[in-house]
Amino acid sequence: MSLIREIAGGPYALAAGPDGAMWVTLVHDGAIARVGADGAVDRFPVADGSRPSLISAGPDGALWFTRNGDDRIGRLTTAGELTEFPLSEGSAPFGICAGADGALWFTEMGSGGIGRITVDGETSGWASVGGTPSMITRGPDDAVWFTLNQGNAIGRLHPRDGVTMRELPTRGAGPVGITATHDDAIWFTEILADKLGRIPLDGALQEIDLPGKPHAVVADPSGGVWVSLWGADRLARVSADGDIETFDLPPGSEPHGLAFGPDGGLWVALESGFVLRMPD
């Protein structure tokens, strides 16, 4: 099954909700959209200039998202109830993920920090890492892993171990997207170097050439990863062995966020104004 829905406002990132719908940030309109299993679209205004960016399902059954434009974390229930939690001015939160500890972890691009927020809304600044931290994911080791877009490194944070950094071999790589796969590895994109990286928990860092300005990356439940090629209007599927298959999108699509839906289908946010479910 394939599905495409026109949604104005700059669809940027997606997450599957516990209600069987896909939830989408609209970065230009300051809103969140819900795409139901039947394809119906509902919009939930957030605030002008809020720039909702990344979104994650929380352990409390709500959707949590970063408000990069007005320094807040947002929480939206599946019933449409919105709550906001202010952060320090200029923090510019961006990436967010659910951690192993039952809290949400997020990056602060502006202040260079990694933050934590409980489902009750208690926020804390956990680490100052610099380097413009971008996206963040829970790793197979229950740490959170994140990209340092201007620091040219991958970071790992665990409350027990603190912060460790892995410098990238390619200078000026501009890492952005990051995800964990079931084979105990961390995958990440290098948008400025046209590469995809992989860090096995028990091995050395690897890089694969992947032209097209790779942006977001998501683990494929059947193995390997999917990558949005923002600069080429394509998607790429990369196997665990490094084999690459690409899929063309309409010109000017600007593919960004990727997420698998409750039905097992791959969904893509196209900043040009569409949300696409890829054919099975």
Swiss-Prot record:
One of its GO terms (molecular function) is carbon-oxygen lyase activity. Keywords: Antibiotic resistance, Lyase, Magnesium, Metal-binding. GO terms for cellular component: outer membrane-bounded periplasmic space. The active site is at H256. It holds the Pfam family Vgb_lyase. Belongs to the Vgb family. Monomer. This is Virginiamycin B lyase. It comes from Mycobacterium sp. (strain JLS). The lineage of its organism: Bacteria, Bacillati, Actinomycetota, Actinomycetes, Mycobacteriales. The gene is vgb.
